[in-house]
Amino acid sequence: MKNPEAQQDVSVSQGFRMLFYTMKPSETSFQTLEEVPDYVKKATPFFISLMLLELVVSWILKGKPPGRLDDALTSISAGVLSRLPSLFFRSIELTSYIYIWENYRLFNLPWDSPWTWYSAFLGVDFGYYWFHRMAHEVNIMWAGHQTHHSSEDYNLSTALRQSVLQIYTSWIFYSPLALFIPPSVYAVHLQFNLLYQFWIHTEVINNLGPLELILNTPSHHRVHHGRNRYCIDKNYAGVLIIWDKIFGTFEAENEKVVYGLTHPINTFEPIKVQFHHLFSIWTTFWATPGFFNKFSVIFKGPGWGPGKPRLGLSEEIPEVTGKEVPFSSSSSQLLKIYTVVQFALMLAFYEETFADTAALSQVTLLLRVCFIILTLTSIGFLLDQRPKAAIMETLRCLMFLMLYRFGHLKPLVPSLSSAFEIVFSICIAFWGVRSMKQLTSHPWK
């Protein structure tokens, strides 16, 4: 029998306690995997609430927002892309875990025991530490994780900048738990470990006193996101910072942190944000002579090269001055307003798609996913001021009208159905004219 809580909304108290990992074992222990709520999905309104609170606090304390609009849109875009595969497949982190549990478990810990709950808490957090560390020390794993580090801002939207690829290696580090921790208990802590890490992506919280000794905090995680030399490969913790202190990877925040990749990618285009390092590995692999050197390109650190230590040379990491200017869009304010409106519409269709997944045909589901990806890519092109941005936006608006006409996209407000068609027809005409100018003369700026 399914637990009613799996279908119910969480209270305000539960929502914030989910984010701070303070839910009690008695209210988060379930006998079967099917009973486990989708805590990440239920946390969405609390993500939004904290992001708005961060905005207000930042204005009060610093007189400015906590980040830039174009960077925030790119971070949320990455989060959207990372969740799209779950529309078609069950998470590999769960699938692999269930397989090991059903075929190779050594013994069963009771699912309703607080000791099992706390053991899973420690086990998942320990597994996360080692996954996270390897995601920085193994180049092919860094190809996925670098997405999260590509933001040059550090705020709550940065927490949403997730990788499409990362999940395909992270499951390995949690697999040993399947020898004795029931899948339902694991699924709870896998979500809570992720949710906890949302609120630590902020600059509006300074030092948390004694909690800094035990927990991963905004201060500790700011160091992890820094590209200063003293920040590189430090503070891998998920929840407990003690792992870094035990294994020698801890570093306290002691100077202004400059965020982002050591070699910034300077784009807001989400596909490039996700996959650019894979192309870099591919190019380096073929340019590097020798079988063992090629092997090392894939499995040693991102900074490795022939004749260098496994993790590369720290002196090759570019120095920072603290005066670095983050990459920003040169688009007009009017264009930014347009992208925000289109992004908001896409999010509405995205949420509706997840809510109605069971009722949608595979064709409709696939077309919606294609539209979402095209929308995110087109917005990235517009913010980057790419030469072919107008052409892509024309095609995107045309696709919207076609999906709308053939019933693959529902009107968000039925009474405004005609208005939507008129607005998108105008957009097609506008961007179509821009496209013709691009094709016949110079790129539009």
From Swiss-Prot:
Consequence recorded when altering H224A: Loss of function
EC class (word): oxidoreductase
Entry superkingdom: Eukaryota
Cellular localisation: Endoplasmic reticulum membrane
Annotated GO biological process: ether lipid metabolic process; membrane lipid metabolic process; triglyceride biosynthetic process
GO cellular component annotations of the record: endoplasmic reticulum; endoplasmic reticulum membrane
Topology of this chain in the membrane: Multi-pass membrane protein
Pfam families associated with the record: AGMP_C (PF24858), FA_hydroxylase (PF04116)
MF-aspect GO terms: glyceryl-ether monooxygenase activity; iron ion binding
UniProt entry keywords in alphabetical sequence: Endoplasmic reticulum, Iron, Lipid metabolism, Membrane, Oxidoreductase, Transmembrane, Transmembrane helix
Signal peptide: none
Transmembrane segments: 43-63, 111-131, 334-354, 363-383, 413-433
Role: Glyceryl-ether monooxygenase that cleaves the O-alkyl bond of ether lipids. Ether lipids are essential components of brain membranes.
Protein name (database record): Alkylglycerol monooxygenase
Organism: Homo sapiens
Gene symbol of the encoding locus: AGMO
